[in-house]
Amino acid sequence: MKIAVIGTGYVGLVSGACFAKMGNSVICVDVDSKKIEALKNGVVPIYEPGLADIVSECYKNGSLKFSTQITEALEHADVLFIAVGTPMGADGQADLKYVLSVAKSIGENLNKPLIVVDKSTVPVGTGAKVHEVIEAELKKRNLDVKFEVVSNPEFLKEGAAVEDFLKPDRVVIGASSEWGFSVMRELYEPFMKNHDRLICMDVKSAEMTKYAANSMLATKISFINEIANICERVGADVNLVRKGIGSDSRIGYSFIYPGCGYGGSCFPKDVEALIHTARQNGFEPELLNAVESRNKAQKRVLFDKIYNFFGGDLKGKTIAFWGLAFKPNTDDMREASSLTLIKLLDEAGAKVVAYDPKASEEAKKYMPNLDVKYAKNKYDALNGADAMVLVTEWSEFRSPDFMEIKERLKNAVIFDGRNQYNAKALAEHGFKYFQIGVKA
């Protein structure tokens, strides 16, 4: 099938590359000419396991092309995916200016039947707005061209996006006609060889499904962090509590890992957008409000532990960071917990030396005015530091040489924001070890 993807960010590039890998003819379009030139030269702007190899392979065999011209995409495509950003506005509402700009360009240049697919995460009712914009532009040109706007939200996990796309646990399609459903069924059929995981519904329900899914996952994270805070105060161990509740099949273990808060491009933005949607429609979402406020508070928890340990005086202290990205296997720094913690430490007069396997360069863009030094490896970050903080649970941090850590640190102190280590073993090594949800 001939496919166009507008936007070469995280969602757009993964989608375009994976569709090309499955034998489709794909053209990815972006207004950023530097990004397009970089992609043509084999430089992938985001880190995602397996993505660079697919982009390189498909570009070389001609199944994947890159362009800055939407007219080229419209001449090519039977199906066009809108995968541009929907940043959060000052009021918490998703900003649709990029989505609607693409819709306007489609209407201005469309000359043949087309399925337009909203792949971006958009508020309920966006599909109708996109349809209106395209239709209005076609009327200005006195054209009656067949098109349909379909919703096909993405459910990709950063760090496992390629595998998620190629082996989806479900594909949600929101359409308004059998034409839309049939085209999307044909497109996704190669991904459904073992099980039919296509779920068809109306457009608004598909749009809502994305927000509901992310908000549910965020709720689980905030819930276990709430429990963790209670555990610390009553003397319980949240790690054991997690096992006790996770073994219940009705609950499960997914997303009930206590930590220093969720981040990334999806959960914070989508929870806030759903809160805004609810309020716009006369409903106060008390549970979602609590999910959001708990997460904001959770991002301070590690700072409070560090601050209290040093008696409220952090001036001149050096804190070593292991991990900066909002989660492992990505270089994404959007809404990362490390950003909140580093800012608080900086305000308190502390210095930071950080190491992340993939996100250090990206982190520099988010903290241009903060005095953060970046180490070349995890052990070098520790040299002479007053304490170590683990923020991102990269696999290379799982089984470190604790004697090496102890020798390099000024004080044998670890603040663990992801509860990765064995407290008893660390105590035997002479460490003071602080976790989330466990009284020190």
Predicted regions and their residues:
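Structural/interface elements that position substrates and couple domains in central-metabolism enzymes
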Residues: 1-440
